[in-house]
C-alpha cells in the first residue's frame, strides 16, 4: 500500500497529506483488485494504526456495496474468509479494537449478509456463532453485527428501492424459518452469562432483543423464561434502563387484543409487587424517564386493545380492558405531575388517549370525574415556568420546555372536550385567586393564570371569536375574567413573561372590548407606555408592536375617539432612523412596519371626512419623503461601501413603511374615496429617482418594485404614467434575479389594465425580451448550480410573462413585433416545451401554444402560422413527452402532459380533419408508430370529452417509452 498516502488518514495530518489519502481511496475504489491488498492487510493484521484499519474496511465496504456482482466466485470467497479470519483474530487480541472500527466492521458484515444470505451464505449466523462462542470480545462484535443487519433490513430512516425492500422481506422470512430460534437462544445465553459480570454486553444484547422483537415471533420472547430474566434486569441498576426499553418494545408489538391485555397485566403485576410503582421512592430520573415511557406504552397498548374489542363487539373483554386501564391512572398521574419534564412528557400519550376514551363514554363514574380533575390540576401545575428558565437568552432547555408546553396544551384541549364546564370552573378558580393577590405572587404563577385564560379560547372554540355571546354561563365567566385582567393592574407586573401574556390575551379576546368598550382607553395606554411599546425589553416592544396592530385592526370601529391621541403618542416611534444618528431606536424597522400599518388603519377607518384623512396621511408620509430625498443625495455622494449599504437600507425602509400604510385601504375604503391619491403619487415621484441610482441597485430596486406593486392595486390607472420610465430604469444593467423580479410587475399591469397598456407593452416587449435573452445566453461555469437555478427561474418568469400576455387578450402585442421577432418568440416557446427538463416551464409553454392556436390557428390567422403548427407545435407535443427526462410518475410532469393534450385538442378544434389527416398520413408514420396505434390515437383525439384524450395520451406515452 502507498505508505505516504496512508499518513494522510491521521486526523492531525496536514491538508496535502489528507488530499493524497482521499485520492488514494478513490484510486483503490476504482481499481478492480486493489481491494485485495486491504483484505490481506486486515486478515494478516499488517497495520496497527486504527485509521489505516478503518480505511481498509471502508475500501471493502465500497467493494461489497457497489462492485460485488463484478467479482469472481474466488474473490467473493476471499472477502468472506477475510472477515471471518479478522473476527477470529479479535478473540486473541490483547486489546479490543476501537469502537469506530468495530462498528465499521459490523457494517461490512451486514452488507455482505444482505448480499449473500439468500444465495451463498445461508449459514452466516452459525459460522459467526461458532467463531465467537461466548467470548466477550466475540459476543460484542456479534451483537454489533446484528444491530447493523437490523438497520439494513428494518430501519425506516433508510430509503430502500422497491427491489431492496422485496429482498429485505425475503431475508426476514427466511431468517424466521431458519435461524431466529437459534439467535433468540444465543441472546438468552448471553444475557444469562453476562448479566452480573459484563453490563456493557448485556445492555447491547437487550438492545438487540428490543430491535428484533418488532418482526420476529413474539412468543420466543414473551414467555416466562425470557420475561422473568428481563424483569430481573429491572432490579439491576446498570441494566434497568436498557431492560425498560426492551420491555417497551415487547409491549409495543402488535398482537391479539386479549393476549396483549394479559401480557401487559402480568408485567404490571410483577412490576408493582417489585415496588416499581412507588415513584416517590425513586431518585434516578434517567431511569424514571424510561419507566414512564414503558408505562405509556403499556397504557396505550391497553387502550388499543379496548378500541379493537369495542369495535369487534366483545363487550366483556372490553370491560376488562377498561378496568385494566383505570388501574394504571394513579401511576400515570404520579408520572404526569413529576417535577422532571422528560418523565412527565413521556406519559402524555397515555393520558391523552385515556381522555379520548372518557370522551366516548356517555356517563362518567365519580372516579373518572376525579381522574379528569386530577389531570387538569396536573396540567395547570406543569404549565408553570421554573426558576431556571432564562427569558433573556433562551437556549435548548427553554426550547424543550416550549415544546413540552405545546403537548400540555393538547391535553388541555382534550380535557375541554371531556368536560368543558369543569375546565372553565377550574381555570376561573385559579385565575381569580391568583389575580386577587398578583402583587405578592411569584411571576410564574401569575403568568400561568393568564396563560390558562388565553388557552381557553382554543380549548372552548367558537366561530369568529364570539366568546361573549351564546352560552350565558360561559360568556359571563370569560367576561368576568377579562374584566379582572384589564382592571386589576396586572399589566404593570415587573416580568416580561407576564407582560407578554397580558397583551397576547387582550388581543386574543378582542371581542370583549365590543361588549365593554369602557376598558379600551386603559388597554391602549398599556400598549403605548412603558408596559408595551416603550418597555425596557426589546422582545416585549417587538411583540407588542405586532399585537398593537392586531388590536387596532380588529377594533377599528371603536377607535375613533382615540385616533389623534394615538397618532400623537406614536409619533416618535415612526421616525426613520438614519444610520448616522447613532442612537438606538426603540423599535426595529420590522417592528416599525406594524406601527405604520396601524397608523394607516387608524386614518383610513376613521369617521373623518376625506380632507382630514388626506391631511393625516400627509402628516404621516411627508417626513418619510423628506428624509428619503436627503438620504438619496447622501447615498449618491457616499464613498465607503458599508455606509452606502446602510443608507440604502434606510431608504428601503422608508419605501417599505409607505407601502405598509397602503395595506389599510380596501374595496370599501379606496385611496380615492379617502382623498389620498395625491399623497401616494407624491411618494411615487419621491421614490422613483432611486431607480436611477447606480449604487446599491438591488436593494433600492427591490423596495421601489414592491411599492409599485402596491400602487397598481391602490392607485389603479393613476399609476400608469409612471410605469414606462420606471420600467426603463429597471431594465438597465440587469441580472437574472432583477429580471425575474421585474416580470411579475409587468404581469400584474398586463393582467389588470389589459388593453389600456397595449401601447406600453408593444414598446417595451422587445427590449424586455432582449434583456432576458442576453442574460440567458451569458456563459456560466459548468457546475455553477446557483447560476443554473437562476436561469431556470428566469426562463419560467419569461414564459409566465408570455402566458399573461396571451391570456389577457393581448396577443396582438406579440403579432405586432414583426415576423422575424414573432418567429423568434415562438421558437423559444417550442424550446421551452421540449428542450428543458423543467415540467413547470413546459406546462406554461403548452398553455401559451394552445392559446396561440386558439387565437391564430383558424383559417384567418396570421400568414404562415398554420405551417408553424404542423412543423413545430405538433412535433413538440410528441417530442417533449418522449424525452427520457419527461417523468410520467412526477405530478408536475403529468400537469405538463395534460396541457400538451389541450394543445393537441385545440389544434384539432381549429384545423379539423386536416389535422387528423396530417397525423395519420405524415407525422405519426414518421415516428414509426404502428398503423393500428395511429388509428387508435386519432380516434381518441376526436372524442368530444377532453378528459378521455388526456387519459389516453398518458397511456400512449407510457407504452411508447422503453
From Swiss-Prot:
Its main location: nucleus. SUPFAM superfamilies: ARM repeat. GO terms for biological process: intracellular protein transport; tRNA export from nucleus; tRNA re-export from nucleus. It comes from the Eukaryota. It is found in: Nucleus; Cytoplasm. GO terms for molecular function: small GTPase binding; tRNA binding. The keyword rRNA-binding does not apply. Residues 443-962 are annotated as: Necessary for tRNA-binding, cytoplasmic localization and nuclear export. The modification N6-acetyllysine is found at residue 634. Gene3D superfamilies: Leucine-rich Repeat Variant. Residues 1-385 are annotated as: Necessary for interaction with Ran, nuclear localization and nuclear import. InterPro entries: ARM-like (IPR011989), ARM-type_fold (IPR016024), Exportin-1/Importin-b-like (IPR013598), Exportin-T_C (IPR045546), Importin-beta_N (IPR001494), XPOT (IPR040017). Pfam families: Exportin-T, IBN_N, Xpo1. Belongs to the exportin family. Mediates the nuclear export of aminoacylated tRNAs. In the nucleus binds to tRNA and to the GTPase Ran in its active GTP-bound form. Docking of this trimeric complex to the nuclear pore complex (NPC) is mediated through binding to nucleoporins. Upon transit of a nuclear export complex into the cytoplasm, disassembling of the complex and hydrolysis of Ran-GTP to Ran-GDP (induced by RANBP1 and RANGAP1, respectively) cause release of the tRNA from the export receptor. XPOT then return to the nuclear compartment and mediate another round of transport. This is Exportin-T.
Amino acid at each position: 500500500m502507498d505508505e505516504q498516502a496512508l499518513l494522510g488518514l491521521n486526523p492531525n495530518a496536514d491538508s496535502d497529506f489528507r488530499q493524497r489519502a482521499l485520492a488514494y481511496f478513490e484510486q483503490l475504489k476504482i481499481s478492480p483488485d486493489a481491494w485485495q491488498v486491504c483484505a490481506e492487510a486486515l486478515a494478516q493484521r499488517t497495520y496497527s494504526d486504527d485509521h489505516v484499519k478503518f480505511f481498509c474496511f471502508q475500501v471493502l465496504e465500497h467493494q461489497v456495496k457497489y462492485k460485488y456482482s463484478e467479482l469472481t466466485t474466488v474473490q467473493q470467497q476471499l472477502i468472506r474468509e477475510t472477515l471471518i479470519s479478522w473476527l477470529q483474530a479479535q478473540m486473541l487480541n490483547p486489546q479490543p479494537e476501537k469502537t469506530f472500527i468495530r462498528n465499521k466492521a459490523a457494517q461490512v458484515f451486514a452488507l455482505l449478509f444482505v448480499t449473500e444470505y439468500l444465495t451463498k451464505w445461508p449459514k452466516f449466523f452459525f459460522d459467526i456463532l461458532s467463531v465467537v462462542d461466548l467470548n466477550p470480545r466475540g459476543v460484542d462484535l456479534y451483537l454489533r453485527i446484528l444491530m447493523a443487519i437490523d438497520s439494513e433490513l428494518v430501519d425506516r430512516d433508510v430509503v430502500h428501492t422497491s427491489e431492496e425492500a422485496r429482498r429485505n422481506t425475503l431475508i426476514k422470512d427466511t431468517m424466521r424459518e431458519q435461524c431466529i430460534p437459534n439467535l433468540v437462544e444465543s441472546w438468552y445465553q448471553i444475557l444469562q452469562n453476562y448479566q452480573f459480570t459484563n453490563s456493557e454486553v448485556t445492555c447491547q444484547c437487550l438492545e438487540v432483543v428490543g430491535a428484533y422483537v418488532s418482526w420476529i415471533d413474539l412468543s420466543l420472547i414473551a414467555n416466562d423464561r425470557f420475561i422473568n430474566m428481563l424483569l430481573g434486569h429491572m432490579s439491576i441498576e446498570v441494566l434497568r434502563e436498557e431492560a425498560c426499553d426492551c420491555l417497551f418494545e415487547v409491549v409495543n408489538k402488535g398482537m391479539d387484543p386479549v393476549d396483549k391485555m394479559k401480557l401487559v397485566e402480568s408485567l404490571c403485576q410483577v412490576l408493582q409487587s417489585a415496588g416499581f410503582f412507588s415513584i416517590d421512592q425513586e431518585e434516578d430520573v434517567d431511569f424514571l424517564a424510561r419507566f414512564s415511557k414503558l408505562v405509556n406504552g403499556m397504557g396505550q397498548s391497553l387502550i388499543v386493545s379496548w378500541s379493537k374489542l369495542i369495535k369487534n363487539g366483545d363487550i366483556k373483554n372490553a370491560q376488562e380492558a377498561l378496568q385494566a386501564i383505570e388501574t394504571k391512572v394513579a401511576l400515570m398521574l404520579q408520572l404526569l405531575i413529576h417535577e422532571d419534564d422528560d418523565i412527565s412528557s413521556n406519559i402524555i400519550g397515555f393520558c391523552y388517549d385515556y381522555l379520548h376514551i372518557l370522551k366516548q363514554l356517555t356517563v362518567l363514574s365519580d372516579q373518572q370525574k376525579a381522574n379528569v380533575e386530577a389531570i387538569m390540576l396536573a396540567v395547570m401545575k406543569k404549565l408553570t415556568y421554573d426558576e431556571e428558565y432564562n427569558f433573556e437568552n433562551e437556549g435548548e432547555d427553554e426550547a424543550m420546555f416550549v415544546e413540552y408546553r405545546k403537548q400540555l396544551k393538547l391535553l388541555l384541549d382534550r380535557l375541554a372536550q371531556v368536560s368543558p364546564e369543569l375546565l372553565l370552573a377550574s381555570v376561573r378558580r385559579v385565575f381569580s385567586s391568583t389575580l386577587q393577590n398578583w402583587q405578592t405572587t411569584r411571576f410564574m404563577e401569575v403568568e400561568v393564570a393568564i396563560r390558562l385564560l388565553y388557552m381557553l379560547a382554543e380549548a372552548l372554540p367558537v366561530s369568529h371569536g364570539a366568546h361573549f355571546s351564546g352560552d350565558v354561563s360561559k360568556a359571563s365567566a370569560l367576561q368576568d375574567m377579562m374584566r379582572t385582567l384589564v382592571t386589576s393592574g396586572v399589566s404593570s407586573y415587573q416580568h416580561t413573561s407576564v407582560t407578554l401574556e397580558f397583551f397576547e390575551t387582550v388581543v386574543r379576546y378582542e371581542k370583549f372590548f365590543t361588549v365593554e368598550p369602557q376598558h379600551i382607553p386603559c388597554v391602549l395606554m398599556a400598549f403605548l407606555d412603558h408596559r408595551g411599546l416603550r418597555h425596557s425589553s426589546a422582545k416585549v416592544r417587538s411583540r407588542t408592536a405586532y399585537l398593537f396592530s392586531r388590536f387596532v385592526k380588529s377594533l377599528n370601529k371603536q377607535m375613533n375617539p382615540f385616533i389623534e391621541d394615538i397618532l400623537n403618542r406614536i409619533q416618535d416611534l415612526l421616525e426613520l432612523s438614519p444610520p448616522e444618528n447613532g442612537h438606538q431606536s426603540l423599535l426595529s424597522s420590522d417592528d416599525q412596519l406594524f406601527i405604520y400599518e396601524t397608523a394607516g388603519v387608524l386614518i383610513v377607518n376613521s369617521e373623518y371626512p376625506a380632507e382630514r384623512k388626506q391631511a393625516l396621511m400627509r402628516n404621516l408620509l411627508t417626513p418619510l419623503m423628506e428624509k428619503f430625498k436627503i438620504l438619496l443625495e447622501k447615498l449618491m455622494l457616499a464613498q465607503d461601501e458599508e455606509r452606502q449599504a446602510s443608507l440604502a437600507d434606510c431608504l428601503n425602509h422608508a419605501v417599505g413603511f409607505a407601502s405598509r400604510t397602503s395595506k389599510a385601504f380596501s374595496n370599501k375604503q379606496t385611496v380615492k374615496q379617502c382623498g389620498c391619491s395625491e399623497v401616494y403619487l407624491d411618494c411615487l415621484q419621491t421614490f422613483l429617482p432611486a431607480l436611477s441610482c447606480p449604487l446599491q441597485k438591488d436593494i433600492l430596486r427591490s423596495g421601489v418594485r414592491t411599492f409599485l406593486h402596491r400602487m397598481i392595486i391602490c392607485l389603479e390607472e393613476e399609476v400608469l404614467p409612471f410605469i414606462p420610465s420606471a420600467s426603463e430604469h429597471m431594465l438597465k444593467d440587469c441580472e437574472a434575479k432583477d429580471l425575474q423580479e421585474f416580470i411579475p410587475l409587468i404581469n400584474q399591469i398586463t393582467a389588470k389594465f389589459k388593453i389600456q397598456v397595449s401601447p406600453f407593452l408593444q414598446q417595451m416587449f422587445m427590449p424586455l425580451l432582449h434583456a432576458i435573452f442576453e442574460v440567458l445566453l451569458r456563459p456560466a461555469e459548468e457546475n455553477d448550480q446557483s447560476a443554473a437555478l437562476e436561469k431556470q427561474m428566469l426562463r419560467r418568469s419569461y414564459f409566465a410573462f408570455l402566458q399573461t400576455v396571451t391570456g389577457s387578450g393581448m396577443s396582438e402585442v406579440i403579432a405586432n413585433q414583426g415576423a422575424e421577432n414573432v418567429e423568434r418568440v415562438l421558437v423559444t416557446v417550442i424550446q421551452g416545451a421540449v428542450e428543458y427538463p423543467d415540467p413547470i416551464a413546459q406546462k406554461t409553454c403548452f398553455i401559451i401554444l394552445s392559446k396561440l392556436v386558439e387565437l391564430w390557428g383558424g383559417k384567418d390567422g396570421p400568414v404562415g402560422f398554420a405551417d408553424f403548427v404542423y412543423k413545430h407545435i405538433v412535433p413538440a407535443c410528441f417530442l417533449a413527452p418522449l424525452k427520457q427526462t419527461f417523468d410520467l410518475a412526477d405530478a408536475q410532469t403529468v400537469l405538463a402532459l395534460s396541457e400538451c393534450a389541450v394543445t393537441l385538442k385545440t389544434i384539432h378544434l381549429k384545423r379539423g380533419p386536416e389535422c387528423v389527416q396530417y397525423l395519420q398520413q405524415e407525422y405519426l408514420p414518421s415516428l414509426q408508430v404502428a398503423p393500428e396505434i395511429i388509428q387508435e390515437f386519432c380516434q381518441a383525439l376526436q372524442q368530444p370529452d377532453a378528459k378521455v384524450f388526456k387519459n389516453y395520451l398518458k397511456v400512449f406515452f407510457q407504452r411508447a417509452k422503453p
